[in-house]
C-alpha cells in the first residue's frame, strides 16, 4: 500500500508568484504548491522544517528558495523542474563582517565588508523575505528581529558576499525593523532594494573591491515622502524605483539620490492639440507652465492618492507600460508607467488608466490585497492574492471601450483553523468547515471547489451522514446546530467544470441547542439519529428523516459532572444497522430494553472515560414525542474508565461495539476491546480498562484517527504535522516506511499541525485537515507497490539476461532452456477464480439482504396518503369605525416619532424659543437637579463599594502580614531561622482614598529622595549642615565614653546577656535545664564518663537525655508546622495582591475598550464623510470630462471655426478661477494637492482625483546634470514667453520654476549608472526588463557599465536641451492669454453659436471652480483623519498590552498554584506511617481548590509514584533473576558432582553378562510390544468413533427435516391468523358503525341546544357593545382632541412636543448636561 499526495487545498494569504508562463506558486501549510492554471495540475513541494515563512522564485533559471520557520531557520534552494534540493544555507551561522579599513566605514553609512570576519555570529531567529538575482547566482536573505540583517549569498558556493543590519529610521536613531520585501535590480545583481515599516526602505549597493566588497545602504532622502507616510512596498521599473506608502501614495524614486524623480513638461502646441482632439479635448496638466503654453519647470513623480480611500499600498507590480497599485481596502488601480528613455515616453506617464475589480459588485471589497505580480506568457496577466484565502487573475491591459477590468477567481480556500473533514455520503468529495464560518465541498480527484455555504459564526464541529443520505451537520461556537442538504458530487463537479454557479448547500435544520461551542456531532449508522455534544455539558439527540427532509430534537441528557466530550463514534454491527430492533414497541422511553438490539454511540470523555449511549427502538422509529417539558431524555448510559484519555476515537464494525481505536493523550495509538457484559462497565471510578495493544504514534498529542470503509486500514494525524497509515494490527505499512513519506510534515507545525483525518466513501482517498487552514488529499493504491516490485523483478531479469549474453558461448543458455513454471501459473489462475467467486457470492448476499430490509421497512412505515388534511379557521375583522380610530391613533404616533427622529433627541418637556410659565420652568429645574443628584448618588455608591472592597483587602493583607511576623517570632524563639524564600518584603495596598488633599500631598509635591539631579546648596545652608554634623559627632563621642546601656549591663547582668540558670531559656518551651551537677562539671552530656559519676547521677542523666530527645522531636514538629503556616500566609497574601492588581487591570481594560469604541465610531463617521467628499469630487471630474468629450458634438456646425473655438475653450487666465464661486484662496492653494494644475492650454482631471502628469523622465544622475537641464529649460521658457508677448497679447505669467536637482546633503554611493533595458527588445514585449540578445550590450551583467559615466551624462544633457528647446518653439504660437472674449470672436461665426460657446465655456469654468472647492474640502477632511487613526491604534495597542498583562498575571497565578512544595522528613532506614489526626476546625487559612485541580495533581503524583514502584519492581525482578541464576549454577554444580560420582561407581562396578546385555540393547523389548498393542487399540477406537459420529449426523439431518416441516406449518398458521385478523377487524368495524349511529342523534341534539344558547349570548353582548360605543363616542366628543388626516401632515408646521417631563434620555442620545444647557 502506497500513499501519494493527490492535491493541496489551501492558501496562507501571503506571497503568490509566477513560476512559468502558466504556472504559479503559493504557500499551503508546510508546502509550496506549484499550480498550472490551464490544466489545474499541481505539484507539491514539502518543507523540511516546522513551517514555511517565505519563498522566492527565479523564473528565468527555474529556481525556488524556501525559508523554514524556527529559531535557527534554514534556507533551501530547489529546482522547479525536478523539485530536487540544490543547496542549503544557514543564515544563523553567518558572522558579522568588518569593513577592513577606515575608508570603508563612514559614519552612518553602514558599510560592511563581505570577505573578512571580525565579529561573532549573527542572531537570525527568522527569515522575513527572500529574493533571487536575475542571473540566478545571488540570493538575498532578510532576517527578523533582533538583528534585522540583510545577507547576500553566492548560494552555489554557500559564500556570503555581503551582510549588514537594516539602517535605523530617521525618527529613531537606534531601533531598526525587519524588511518585509526585498528584490534585486533586474539588470544589475549588485543593486537591491528593501522596504517595510519603520524606515526599512533603502537601496543597497554591493561594490566589489580588490580584497573585499563594500555593502552599504542608501536611505530615503529627507522630505522624500509626505509627512506621516512610510514605505510599505516597492517594485523596480525602467524609470526608477516605485514605492507605495502607508497613506495610499505612489512615488517614483531616483536610485542615485533616493529622492522623488523629477518629471519635466512634455511638448505642447500642435502636438497637444492633436492629443487633445484624439481624447475629446482633455489633456494632462503640466505643473509650472504658464497659461500661454510655454513649457515650464519640473515636478516630482508623486501620485499622492493612488489609493483613493487613503489606505496603505500593499503591493506593486508592473510591466513595460502599466503599473498596478493594490491597496489595503481591496482596490487595484492601474497607472501609466514612466518609460526608460525620452524616445519611449507615453502621452500621460503616471496617469490613471483603469481599475481592476476583484468582485462584480464594485472596485473594492474591504479585504486587503496581500500580494500582486504581473506575469504570464505575454507578461500582461495580473495575479492577486488576498488574506481571506482567495486568489484572482486579471488582465493588466485596459478593456476595450473603457471601464473597469474584472478578475477571475483562481483559488478560494479556508482561512484559519479547520474544524474537521468528512467524506461526502455520495462519494467523490470531502466536506470541510472551520473558524471562517464556511462549509465547503472539495473534489477528491483534483481538489476543485464544488460547493460553498457561508455561515454567520465560526464552526467547531462537522459530521456527515452514512452513505444513502446526502446530509451533513455543522456546529458553531455559539451552540447552533445546522443540518445541510448536500448536492451530488457529480453535479457539482460538472457545474465547476463549466464555470456555472456552484450548487447551493440548503439548510434543512437550524436551532441553538447549546449555550457553549459544539464539540462533537455524529450520525447513527441508519441516518435516523443525530447526536450533538457541547461544552455546556449537554448532549442532544435529534431525529432525522432523510426521506421527508425533517429534523426534530428528541431531548437532551447531561454528561458526567466536569466532563467534556473529545470524540464520538457510532459503530455499526456486522449483521446490519439494526433495523429490525423493536420498532413496534409503544409507551415512554424505557431503560430496560434488551441490550444488544440497538446500536450504541461511544463518547470519549476528557477525564479518561468512555461513555456508551444506547437509544431505544422507539427513538429510532421517528414517531416518538418527548412527554417531558424540560426535554429530558431517558436512555441507557454505561461508563467505562480507560487508562488514558482518548483524544480521537474510531470504531471497526463488530458484533456488539466492535474494536475501538483511539489516539491517546500519551501520544500513542490504542486498540480497545470493549467488554460485552454490562457488569464490566463499572463507571469512571472503577479499575481502568487496559488497552489490548498500544504503539507510539506521533510526537504531539492532539490530532485525529480514521478507519477505512473496508475496515482494513487505520490513518492517524497529529499536531506534529504527520499522517501515518497502519493496518489493524497497528503496524506501519512498509510501503510508507520506505517511500517518500507523502503524508509526513505537509502541515504547519507552528500553527497546530493536523486536526483530523478522514477517508472518502470508497476508501481510495485520504484527506488531512490542519490548524493552518490547509487540506491535503492523498491517494491510496496497491498499484504503486506492485509496480515497484514488478520493476525490481524486471531489473533483476534484465541483469540475468545481460549476464547470460556476456557469458561464454558454450556456457550460454538458449531460449528453449529457460523453463516456465506452468504449475504455478495454473495455481494462480485457480486462486483468482476462487476469489472472484467468493466476492460475487458476498455481493449477491449483500444485495439480497438490502432488498429484504427495504421490503420490511416499506411494509412498516409506508403510507399511501402523501398529503395530510388540515383545519383552517380565521379571525373576524373588526367593524369599520374601529379601523378608522386605529388609523388616526397610528398616524398621530407616526408624526410624533418623525418629529423626534428629525430633532435627534427626546426632550424633557421644554422646547427652545417657546414661552412657558414659571411653574413649568421651576419644575424643569427640579427635574434636572433630581437627575444630577441621582447621578451623584450612583457614583458615590459605586465609589463606596470600591473603597470598601479595597479597605477589606488592605485589612486582610495587614492581618496576614501580622500573622507572618508572629510566625517568624515563634520560629526565632525556637532557634530556627525561616527559609530564605520566605524572608521577602511585606505586601501592602494603600487603603488611603485619593482625596484632593492626598493628591496634593503625594502627586503634586516632590520629595527630596525623588530628585535625581544634584541639589544646589547655598553657603549659609552648607555651614548650617556642617555645624549639625559636628554636633552629632561630639554627642557620639560623649556617648561612647559613658554609655548608659553598657553601664547597666555590667551592673545588672554581669556584662553578658546569657540566660541564667545554666543556659535555660524561659521563653523557649522546648529548652530543658541541665542538672546542677552536670552544669558544675562543665562538659557536654554526651561526653560524661559513666565511670566517674554515681549510679543516681547516671540514671538522672539518662532521664534528662530522654526528655531532651522528646523535646527536640516536638520542637522539630513545631518548626515544620510554623513553616507551613508561613508558606500558607504568604500564598494567601500573594493571591490577594494579584487579585487586586487584576481587578485594576480589568477596570483599565474596560475604560480602554469604551474609549476605543468611541474613537472607532468617530473615525467611521469621519471616513464616511470623507468617502462622500471623494465621490462628489469624482462626480465633478466626470462632469468635466463629459463636457470636454461633448465639445465637438455641441459645436459641430462651426465647421472651419472649430479649431479656433477649441483653442479658446482651452485657454485659461489665473484670475478666472479666483473670481468663480468657491475658487478663491482654497482653490488656488490646493490646486496641486487635489490634482488640478495649470497647463499650457487646458485643465484636466483624472478619475479619482489622481493627477495626470504630462511630463518626461529625467535621466540625470548628478546634481550638476539636473541643474544644467533645469537651467536650459528655464531659458527656453523665457524665450518662448518673449515671443508670445511680441505677438500682440500680454503675457500671463512667468515661465515657471526651473528644475531643481537632488538635495545637497545626499551623496551618491554607486560608482556607475544603472543599466537600461535594450531598446530593440523592449519594443517587442511587455516585460519591463526583457532578456537582451547575445552581444547586444553588457547592461544585463551585474556590475558592468557600457559607457563611461562622463559620456553617459553628456548624452543625457544633450537630450534634455533639445527637448526643452523644441517644446518652447512649439508653444511660442499659443502664448497669447485671453482677457476679453468679446474681441476674440472669429470672423464669420454665427452670433447665436458664439453666445452658446460663451455660456458653455462659463459652465466649464464653473465646473472647474467647483472641483477646486471640492478638493479644498477634501484636504480639510483628510487633515484630522491620521490623528484619529493614530489615536484608535494607540487605544488598540493599550488594550493589547492590558490583555497581555492580565494573561501573564493569570498564567503566573496558575504556575504558582501548581508550584507547591511538600516537605517529608523520614528517619534513616525506615518509613514511619503516622496515625491520622483529627482535622482542625479553623478554616481561615484554607484555600478552595477545584476538584479537577486536585484530581489532576493526584494523577501526576500517582503517575510518578507508579513509575517509582515500577523501578523498584524492576530492580527486585532483576535481583530475583540474579539469585535464580546463582541457584541454577549451584544446582548444576551439584548435578555434575552426582554424575561424576555415578560414573565413578559404574567404573568400579563388577561387569556381568546381564549388564552387558542391558548396555547393548538400551531398554527392555517388552516396551515395544506394549506400544504395538496400544496402537492397535487406538485404531479400533477411531473406527468406532467414526461410526458413532455418522449415526449422530444422520439423526441431525432428520431433526433438520422435522424443523423445516414445522416451519412450513407455522407459516401456514401465520397466514391463517392474518386472515382471521382481517375478519375480526371487519366485525369490529360493523359493530362500531352500528353503535355510532345511535350516538350521533344524541350528539346532534346537544349541539343544536348549545348553538342556540351561544347565539343568545352573542346577541346580548353585541347590544351591550353598541351601548358602550355610544357612550364612548359621547365622551370622545367632549374630551378627545381632533384627529388629523394623513394627507395634511406634510404641510403642517412642527407641533410642540407633548412628552411628559419625566421621560428619560434613550441610550446613545446627547448627555443630560447638554440638554440642561439648552434649557
UniProtKB/Swiss-Prot annotation:
Residues 1221-1233 have a biased composition (Gly residues). Residues 1524-1609, 1651-1679 form a coiled coil. WD repeats lie at residues 122-165, 174-214, 226-263, 308-345, 413-452, 513-552, 697-736, 749-788, 1073-1114. InterPro entries: Quino_amine_DH_bsu (IPR011044), WD40/YVTN_repeat-like_dom_sf (IPR015943), WD40_repeat_dom_sf (IPR036322), WD40_rpt (IPR001680). GO terms for cellular component: axoneme; motile cilium. Residues 1257-1269, 1344-1358 have a biased composition (Low complexity). It is found in: Cell projection, Cilium, Flagellum; Cytoplasm, Cytoskeleton, Flagellum axoneme. Its main location: other. Residues 94-120, 569-596, 1022-1045, 1220-1269, 1277-1296, 1325-1372, 1685-1719 are annotated as: Disordered. Residues 1709-1719 have a biased composition (Polar residues). Keywords: Cell projection, Cilium, Coiled coil, Cytoplasm, Cytoskeleton, Flagellum, Repeat, WD repeat. The keyword Coiled coil applies. Belongs to the CFAP43 family. Flagellar protein involved in flagellum axoneme organization and function. This is Cilia- and flagella-associated protein 43. It comes from Chlamydomonas reinhardtii.
